[in-house]
Amino acid sequence: MDRMEIDDQAGIDFVTESINSERARNRWSTSHIPSLSEINPSSFQSPSPSPFASSTSLASKPARYSKPLGLFVLDTNFLLSHLSLCQNLIEFLTARCPRLVVVLPWTVLQELDGLKSESSSTCGYLARQAHNFLLQCFRSNVSSLRGQKVHEHCSSTEKGDDAILDCCIYYQEEKLIPAVLLSDDKNLSIKAAVHHIQSLSFSKGLEAASIVQTSFPSAFSSNSENLENLSMDIDLTVSQPLATATNHRNQGASTVDIPMDRTHDNSIWASRYAHFPPYDKKKDTTRSAADYIPYTYTALTKEEILHASHPRACKLLDQITKIMVEETAFLLSRHLLKLWGDYDLAMTKLLASPQFPPQNINDVGHELYIHWYTCFDGYLPAQERSNLKSKAELWNEWMLWAERGIGIGPKNQEELQTYVTFWSNIWTLLSRREILGDQASTYIGFREQNIEKWVERSGRERILS
């Protein structure tokens, strides 16, 4: 199909200025439109053959998860003006550099949706052209293209080019994945440079290979990595947390471990698989930091996992539970410290609940339900709060099934992966850079290392056997 391509500076400036003008009018500020990365590709009627149909099934073979080495973040003006170059870049990454990914910011998806309805304008035609191409890509499950999800941001209030910049900052600072902005907007490129985000604009002769070579030269030496040789190991390796709650009364002179409530049943079985107790405010107790001892979730031993009913799932579920139990206590203390500004007051609020610090996944669900708006307001829709306890209960049932063969497990691998993603997102939002302060870089590295393991393992064959 013939495409309109814009490669002269006057045309590029026209597209960029047109989009900036519409952004200034706030025309496409509506939020929560469906992300292309979350739409079921089978629901589309392809308007024309996929541009990847002849690419020897490059996109049809699902790759095992591996954290990207880098991202290219597309601005709307770059996508509209240079669609063929964007297609070449995606094809190049799919074939040669599978650990580099092109990301469509949420705002770009919104702007495409708004622009494509403008039948009489040049930008409208370019938007429809780009929209059809993207639908074909997602229909083909192209692994080197994804959309920014609604929760993947540092600030929920940014709009227009600031939202695109926020997308770059989120991936580079919160996910520790280097991001390169592809944009013809000089002002946005300057903003990106201020935040140490690399940017590239179109120039005559620019090709996909040169974009990658300039941005990520090491990708060429690592693109031969064979991700298919990852094997299922029944080890108990879990990356250890590198951050603890700072005692602000002593200005960082010591650290405070979030302790176990002595009134809980201390047996491993009781704490690991406890159900939600009826919540009774009369049972709330006033406790202070001096009354606590550290609580550490007791993970299953290697021998226990090997003798479990479903060892692969058992290992994964237990490791995720250990992280969520231990890290939720620490992170909630940081959120409330930020809210109240006083360590003792924050701890008093947390410890009013008998389920704090949590000892099992249901305690985690209970505490996050209580403090939902403190932690997630503006990041997750409020209706997610009502599902939190049921998700924790179901996870708890899966743990019993995996270890003892009691009850039912996940319906299929897709359901397991959905829940792994859920807890990964909860942890990511709990441990935002602004909450962690000086410990952010170290802690985020620890978090991303673990999440990468979870997602990769949940996608392995025979995980539920």
UniProtKB/Swiss-Prot annotation:
Keyword field contains Nucleus: yes
Pfam families (alphabetical): PIN_4
GO BP terms: nuclear mRNA surveillance of mRNP export
SMART domains membership: PINc
Subcellular location: Cytoplasm; Nucleus
Gene Ontology terms for molecular function: RNA endonuclease activity
Domain PINc: 70-190
Bilayer-crossing regions: none
SUPFAM superfamilies per record: PIN domain-like
Annotated InterPro entries: PIN-like_dom_sf (IPR029060), PIN_dom (IPR002716), SWT1_Regulator (IPR052626)
Role this protein plays: Involved in transcription.
Protein's recorded name: Transcriptional protein swt1
Native organism: Schizosaccharomyces pombe (strain 972 / ATCC 24843)
